């Protein structure tokens, strides 16, 4: 993941990866049958890390607003702390790689959106007095906002942090989705 951060827009070769880790290419291939499997391992690590923490958020938070907020903030903070993963999530690091890897990242992000959708669906069922919104577009908006912040982070060569301005942006979502209308 560090190499993905250090070489924005560039492809990572197995030779460069072997040199970075301090082993031979042959040693890498003894553990991973292909470069695609190496990238797949990174995606699997990200998925496991994110969904373990999402499970904790679901247990620790008892209402929809903090659950959604913490899940989206988790994604932004994860890529901010691990910029190489931002390139994976933005698709930048997967240019020229197999379609299966791109689909794997899409599946990971889709799972996050599905989690947001489920939280919002339960929230709508419990809170009839809240502003009327459609669950699917709202969950999609939350994830699209996070993906846009990740893309800006990659495009700025990791200078424009995804969490900069996040409290103000979330306040807009919170106001339109979770705040009871004033009569």
Task: Map each language-model feature to its residues.
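Short hydrophobic/aromatic patch on the recognition helix
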Residues: 22-32
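Helix-turn-helix DNA-binding elements, focusing on the entry/boundary residues of the two helices
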Residues: 3, 14, 25
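Ser/Thr-centered, proline-biased regulatory motifs
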Residues: 10-16, 36
């Amino acid at each position: 993941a560090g190499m993905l951060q250090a070489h924005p827009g560039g492809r990572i070769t197995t030779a460069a990866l072997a040199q970075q880790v301090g082993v031979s290419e042959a040693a890498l291939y003894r553990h991973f049958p292909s470069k695609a499997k190496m990238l797949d391992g990174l995606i699997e690590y990200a998925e496991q890390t994110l969904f373990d923490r999402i499970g904790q958020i679901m247990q620790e938070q008892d209402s929809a607003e903090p659950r959604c907020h913490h899940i989206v903030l988790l994604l932004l903070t994860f890529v901010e702390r691990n910029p190489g993963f931002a390139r994976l999530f933005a698709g930048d690091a997967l240019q020229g790689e197999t379609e299966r890897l791109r689909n794997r990242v899409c599946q990971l992000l889709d799972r996050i959106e599905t989690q947001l959708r489920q939280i919002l669906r339960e929230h709508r069922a419990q809170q009839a007095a809240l502003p009327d919104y459609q669950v699917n577009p709202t969950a999609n908006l939350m994830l699209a906002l996070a993906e846009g912040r990740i893309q800006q982070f990659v495009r700025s060569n990791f200078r424009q942090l995804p969490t900069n301005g996040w409290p103000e942006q979330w306040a807009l979502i919170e106001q339109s989705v979770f705040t009871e209308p004033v009569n």
